[in-house]
Amino acid sequence: MLESTEKGGVRNSIRNCLTVFQNDPLLSGAIAKNLLTERTDIIKPIGYNRTGTAITDTDMNYLLLYLEETYGLTSEKKIAAAIGIVANENGYHPIRDYLNGLSWDGTERIRTCLHHFLGADSDPYTDEALRLFLLGAIHRAFHPGCKFEVMLCLVGGQGAGKSTFFRLLAVKDEWFSDDLRKLDDDNVYRKLQGHWIIEMSEMIATANAKSIEEIKSFLSRQKEVYKIPYETHPEDRLRQCVFGGTSNALDFLPLDRSGNRRFLPVMVYPEQAEVHILDDEAASRAYMEQLWAEAMTIYRSGDFKLSFSPEMVRYLKEHQRDFMPEDTKAGMIQAYLDRYTGSMVCSKQLFWEALNHSFDEPKQWEIREVNDIMNHCVTGWHYFSNPRMFPEYGRQKGWEREAPATDTSNGAEKIPEGFVEVTEQMELPF
C-alpha cells in the first residue's frame, strides 16, 4: 500500500518508490548491485528490449515512464535514490556465482595446462606458479583487497597464444582487460573496474629503473581510492583482479640483484604445445572451466598458501636470472675475488680494482651498487659491520672471505691441505 498525500494523491517519496520496486510483479527482483563492477544491473526482463545488464540512461527513462503511468510517481531524484537502495540490498557477484557452480571431473589439469596450450616445461615450478596464480585470483574474487602481489609472466615469441591464454582464463571476455597502459593515471580504477584478469603486455620489458619500482608498488596495492563521477563521496575500491604479464623479449626482467619476487616468468615453446589454444576455442574454454573447477576444489579444502614454498623461492631467484640482462659488473667483481688472495675487501677497493675505476672517486649510488652485488650476487664472502683498517682505504666496513668448511663427520676437524696434524709425540717439550 502506497502512502498518500493529505489530498489523497500518491506521495512522491523514496518509501513509496521502494515499495514499488520491492512488490511490483514486473520490477521485483529486477534491480541488483553487481559487486564485481560496482554498478547497478537489471537482471531480468522488464517488458522491453535491452542488451547487457548494466543500467543505462534509456533504462532510467523506461522506469520513470513506468512508475509515472502505473503509480503516479514522478520524482526522478527519489526514484533514482530508491533504485540505489534496492540494488544495494540485492547484491550479487558473477565470478563468485560462476566459481561456486563448478564441479570438478577429477582430472588434474593445473600441472600440465601451460605445457598443453603453450609448450611450457612440465616441472614443479611451472605447476606451482600457475597454481599460485589461480588461487590468488579466486581469493581476490571472494576476498577483495586481500594481499596478493605476484604476476604470472608468459615469455616467448609472438603468436604463441600468450594473450589469448589470459583472455580465455578470464572465462568471459568482459572479465578480461588488456587496456592498462599508465599506472599513474588518476582514473586507473576505471581500467580495473569489473575485470578479473588484467594483462600487462610488454610493460615490464619497456620499464626503466624508476618505472619498474612503480610497477612493483602498483602490484602491491590492495585498493584504489576513487570517486565514481555520479557519486558525491570517494570510496576505497578494493581490488578484485590479478595481473598477468606477457613479453616477447627473453630478458624482460629488470636487473634487480635483490630479487624480483613479484614476477613469475614461464618460458613458452609453442612448437611443443599439444594444441594451439585457438584451434578449437570451445574446447579450450571447456578445459579452462575444469581448470578453475580443480583450483576451486583446492581452495575449498583450505590446504594452500598464497606464497611459494621455501625451496621454490630459492629456485625462483636463480630462475629469474635467465630473464634478466647480463650482470657484467657482478661478473667482474666475482672474477676479481676468485683471483684475489687477501682475506677481506671493501667497497672502494672493489670499485677501483675490480671495476677498473682507478682514478675516479665513487659516487654514493656506485658504492650502493657494489654493496648490492656483494650482498646478493657474490659467493664465498660475508659482510662485517665493524670498520676495519685497510692500508690503502682507511677504516671501512666490508666483507671477509668465508672460512673453508670443516669435516666433522668423525668428530675431528679436517686438516687444511699442506699442513700436518701435530701428534702428542711431536709436541714441544715445554
Describe these PLM feature segments:
Residues I197-L219, P254-G259:
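Conserved AAA+/SF3 P-loop NTPase catalytic/coupling segment centered on the Walker-B
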Residues I212-E235:
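Conserved catalytic/switch belt of AAA+ P-loop NTPases
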Residues M1-R109, P124, E128, D360-E361, ...:
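N-terminal nucleic-acid engagement/recognition segments and initiation subdomains in replication
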Residues I298-G342:
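Conserved alpha/beta core segments of nucleic-acid transaction machinery
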Residues S347-F359:
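DNA-recognition alpha helix
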Residues V188-Q193, I228-T246:
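AAA+/SF3 P-loop NTPase mechanochemical coupling elements
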Residues I83-Q193:
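P-loop NTPase catalytic core of nucleic-acid-dependent motor ATPases
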